[in-house]
Amino acid sequence: MIYVFIALAAVIIVMTAASFKKVPPETVFVVERAGSFYASYGEGVHFVVPLLDKVTAKISLAPQCLPLEKAAAVSADQVSLRLSALIRFSVTDAQKYSCSTENTPAALSSLTLTAFRNVISAVSAGDAVKSQDTIEKTVFRAVSAAAEQWGLNVSEIKLTELSLI
């Protein structure tokens, strides 16, 4: 009988110790309770209720770079162009970031590529290659407005390559 109490006490001690979560700097832990969003914990030590709460995501708030590698686009004069870009962003709202889409970086990449293709399809190939700054600014405005709904702050979208195929 005493062994049962010792085992039970050991389980309680281990569960209690495992329930304290230390969140590092520039990181947010997203916690779900009973399968739905409960809270987001910032830097510091937090208590997670055993068997009820679950840390479902550990999100970095540090600035991140997302490459957009060698995609194709067609200009208004039906010339194929190859483009590569770099997207710099940071997470501003962990709840929106973790709950809005299944894979937010992939959605951001897809949205950026679609915006580039839309802008490039409206101009000729020569104009597209000459006016890369204008294209970047137009795409940046479109993408940053949409990315705010996903809890992201897009700080820069830079074309690294725009050339004829």
Regions found by a protein language model. Name each.
Residues V23, V31-A34, L52-I165:
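Amphipathic, interface-forming alpha-helical segments with heptad-repeat character
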Residues Y3, F37-Y41, Y97:
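Sequence-level detector for tyrosine residue identity
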Residues M1-Y3, T104-P105:
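Structural motif marking the loop-to-transmembrane transition
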Residues A7, S40, T134-T138:
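Short, compositionally biased strand/turn segments
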Residues V28-V48:
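Membrane-cytosol interface motif
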Residues I2-F20:
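Single-pass alpha-helical transmembrane signal-anchor segments
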